[in-house]
Regions:
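Conserved redox-active cysteine motifs that mediate thiol-disulfide chemistry
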Residues: 76, 84-101
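Thiol-/selenol-based redox modules, centered on thioredoxin-like
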Residues: 163-194
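Conserved helix-turn-beta segment immediately C-terminal to the redox Cys motif
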Residues: 78-79, 96-116, 133, 180-181, ...
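Conserved hydrophobic/aromatic "anchor" residues
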Residues: 60, 70, 75, 84-85, ...
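Thiol-based oxidoreductase modules, predominantly thioredoxin-like and allied folds used
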Residues: 110-124, 137-146
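A short beta-strand-turn-helix
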Residues: 51-54, 59-80, 104
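N-terminal targeting signals for export/organelle localization
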Residues: 1-56, 194
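Short, internal strand/loop/helix patches
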Residues: 129-167
Length: 194
């Protein structure tokens, strides 16, 4: 058991180091992240880029509170909002009421996957589940205990949110806490009329 915790901590440390390097590179080079470029391109062209030009969102599998696997590919054919978060993260906590509101409004049409960054020490399934229950949130939560989803998405800082269209294309990315207006803008990109 200790070995799994150590491996999870090492994976999380690697994610954080790589994330810091990516953020530093982005700031120094002035380049946008792929999701930001897609958002800017879509707005500049007045419409979505042809699907062939859009990156396909990486599939991942994480586990729900009962230990059942949940994969992004399970939702193909439906727009998806993927949010990487942790219960100890203040900015993550600040955006959750907006996610809950939109989940209650659009949960039948848009899939919401709240991916908890479970490292086994600072963040455990138990602590995250307790936070969700105490806060009264009902959106789906999955646990990324090996950081594979975070690594696949380059979610190097928390919170990070991806907006994925029904065909599985990564349309936009938001790093840091987002407000209701930004969440709505992302939803409009993947589900017009949201």
């Amino acid at each position: 058991m200790k070995k799994k915790q150590t491996l999870a901590l090492l994976a999380l440390a690697l994610v954080l180091v790589l994330g810091g390097a990516a953020v530093l590179y982005q700031r120094l080079s002035g380049e946008n992240l792929p999701g930001s470029q897609l958002s800017a391109q879509e707005e500049a062209d007045g419409g979505a880029a042809p699907p062939a030009e859009l990156p396909v969102a990486p599939d991942f599998t994480a586990y729900d509170a009962e230990g059942e696997p949940v994969s992004l590919s399970d939702f193909l054919g439906k727009p998806v909002v993927v949010n990487f978060w942790a219960s100890w993260c203040g900015p993550c906590q600040s955006e959750m009421p907006d996610f809950q509101e939109k989940y209650l409004e659009l949960g039948e049409e848009v899939a919401f996957l709240m991916v908890n960054m479970t490292d086994g020490s600072r963040e455990t399934v138990e602590s995250a589940a307790a936070f969700i229950e105490e806060s009264g949130y009902t959106f789906p939560v999955v646990y990324d205990s090996d950081a594979s989803a975070a690594i696949a998405y380059g979610a190097y800082s928390l919170p990070t949110t991806y907006f994925i269209d029904a065909e599985g294309h990564a349309i936009a990315r938001a790093t840091g806490a987002i407000d209701g207006e930004t969440l709505q803008k992302g939803l409009d990109m993947i589900y017009p009329g949201a």
